[in-house]
């Protein structure tokens, strides 16, 4: 039987946050966008036992992150995911997680199986204007 890995109860998350050095202070500036996609598309992307959501949506978050760890790290990060259902609960299945630094990629990919890839990630704000991009293998999106 197929089971999702890394599913945790709210109590397990609270305990991990209180007792794990992995949880540290971070600041982030991000642009988040949701958009509707074609019915039938998400079914082609998500693995069983996940099921498509009745209202198929794509979520994109592109950000600049500062982590206050070992003198501080500043890097670009993005996530591209689709909404879905698991046993009647809503969630997001991450398709890819472009990140700027190898250390950030390896930590999440090797520890948690996250779909992280190295890419150039920019996010900036000037007054009311925001611009964010991800570039991987010369392709900007």
Report each predicted region and the residues it spans:
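Internal, well-folded beta-alpha domain core
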Residues: 91-141
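Solvent-exposed loop and beta-edge segments used for protein-protein assembly and interaction
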Residues: 25-27, 54, 72-76, 87-89, ...
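Short, surface-exposed linear patches
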Residues: 53-58, 81-84, 103-106, 117-119
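Hydrophobic/aromatic-rich structural module bridging two neighboring secondary-structure elements via a short loop
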Residues: 66-110
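Context-gated lysine
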Residues: 8, 32, 36, 87-89, ...
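Hydrophobic, proline/glycine-rich low-complexity stretches
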Residues: 1-67
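Structured loops at beta-to-helix junctions and adjacent beta-edge loops in soluble globular domains
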Residues: 34-36, 63, 83-85, 98, ...
């Amino acid at each position: 039987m197929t089971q999702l890995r890394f599913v945790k109860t709210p109590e397990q998350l609270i305990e991990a946050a209180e007792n794990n050095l992995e949880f540290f202070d971070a600041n982030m500036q991000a642009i988040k966008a949701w958009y509707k996609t074609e019915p039938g598309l998400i079914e082609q992307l998500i693995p069983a036992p996940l099921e498509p959501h009745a209202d198929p949506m794509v979520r994109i978050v592109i950000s600049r992150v500062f982590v206050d760890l070992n003198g501080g790290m500043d890097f670009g990060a993005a996530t591209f995911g689709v909404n879905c259902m698991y046993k009647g609960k809503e969630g997001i299945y991450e398709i890819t997680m472009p990140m700027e630094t190898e250390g950030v990629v390896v930590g999440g990919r090797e520890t948690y199986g996250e779909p992280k890839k190295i890419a150039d990630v920019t996010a900036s704000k000037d007054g009311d204007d925001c611009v964010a991009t991800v570039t991987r293998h010369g392709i900007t999106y």
